[in-house]
């Protein structure tokens, strides 16, 4: 398990959000999912509310909804995941990001220490 980066905030549902609006899932979440085989990403331009299911990550074990950690508009998606969904496992905090949001309001988010405490 990698160290939880402190440069972002976390939702209790295991998504992370950076200051520039990039969203992904935590290392803890990708470990629980197992090998990711498919990622269904939201449409660019979609308006979402914090806590709304906006994407799906499918693994060999299960499919899991991904929730928006903040309200806003989807501005970009990580198109590389369509051909390489394993990036979610290999690099959950960098190359495995899912989508970007133009944030209008953050949801109920935790700092890294609080997230680690509740995730373990």
UniProtKB/Swiss-Prot annotation:
Q: Does the keyword Coiled coil apply?
A: no
Q: Specify one Pfam family.
A: GCV_H
Keyword annotations of the record? Lipoyl
**Cofactor(s) this protein requires:** (R)-lipoate
GO process terms (BP)? glycine decarboxylation via glycine cleavage system
All residue ranges annotated as the Lipoyl-binding domain in the record: 20-102
* One term under GO cellular component: glycine cleavage complex
Q: Which residues carry this modification: N6-lipoyllysine?
A: 61
What superkingdom heads the lineage? Bacteria
Q: Which SUPFAM superfamilies match?
A: Single hybrid motif (SSF51230)
Explain how, and how many, cofactor molecules are bound.
Binds 1 lipoyl cofactor covalently.
Belongs to which family? Belongs to the GcvH family.
Q: Do you know which PANTHER family this protein is assigned to?
A: GLYCINE CLEAVAGE SYSTEM H PROTEIN, GLYCINE CLEAVAGE SYSTEM H PROTEIN-RELATED
General function of this protein: The glycine cleavage system catalyzes the degradation of glycine. The H protein shuttles the methylamine group of glycine from the P protein to the T protein.
Q: What is this protein called?
A: Glycine cleavage system H protein
Q: Which organism is it from?
A: Deinococcus radiodurans (strain ATCC 13939 / DSM 20539 / JCM 16871 / CCUG 27074 / LMG 4051 / NBRC 15346 / NCIMB 9279 / VKM B-1422 / R1)
